[in-house]
Amino acid sequence: VKKVFVKTGNFEKFQAAIRAVEARGAPEAGWLLVAGDPARGKSTIVDKWAAQTGAIYLRGKEQWTPSFFLAELAGQLKIDDSLRGKARFQAVITRIGAEQMPVVVDEVQHAMRDNAAVLEVLRDITDLTETIAVLVAGVDDVMRRLARPSLKQIASRIAQVVEFQPNDLGDTALVCQQLADVEIAPDLVAEVHRQSRGLMRPICNAIAGIEAHANRNKLPKVKLADLAGQELCHDWQSRRPQLVKVAAGGR
């Protein structure tokens, strides 16, 4: 499977939301919340954007406290680790403000403990520097938790919400076209889409299996009939493989 970044519909929605946040009227309302079930490409897309823009990328951790968060942020910025308390905070503010560096917090549910104390620190940082923050929700109840009255000051900083959806058939075809080292016929693309339900991880796993079959059989192009009766995607919930079925006369 090729290491290529595919610009799917979710990527385009994310880019549009970033542009809207950049054009915001209220400087303090500079947060973007990215939501959606796992395997929809949230982290991959946001990580790509962070790398392109020079954003600070942090992955939330179960043990996060405000001081732990600030220490990790300072570490990413290569700030003198002997600084503590107000001195460390001021150094972070100075660096982020001077370079207008966005901050990404992936798995933001881990920043919700103790009435979102970590996000209160992030709010102070973005308010003082007027920079953008991107929050990536790894679970589906983050939006509900952010809607609590006690968190209205934090929620008011969110200017845009992007909810990632499963890839449609067109996006699945685009992923197959750009990531596969072998040509995948439209009928097999449709089967990949059906079995994967448009989720990125199963799509990539299916592509890897198709490539392996093509290499074993020296096929420049793989059709649905070529994989009849073989496993394409594994359904872990039912604990059994999903086999490719070909209609009678389809071979």
Where are the language model's segments positioned?
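Conserved catalytic segments around the Walker B and adjacent sensor/switch elements
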Residues: 50-63
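A short helix-turn-beta junction within AAA+ P-loop NTPase domains corresponding to the substrate/partner-engaging
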Residues: 54-55, 148-166
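A structured, charge-rich N-terminal accessory region that forms the first stable segment of a protein
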Residues: 16, 20-25
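Short, well-ordered alpha-helices that flank and scaffold nucleotide-derived cofactor binding pockets
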Residues: 47-51, 75, 124-127, 212
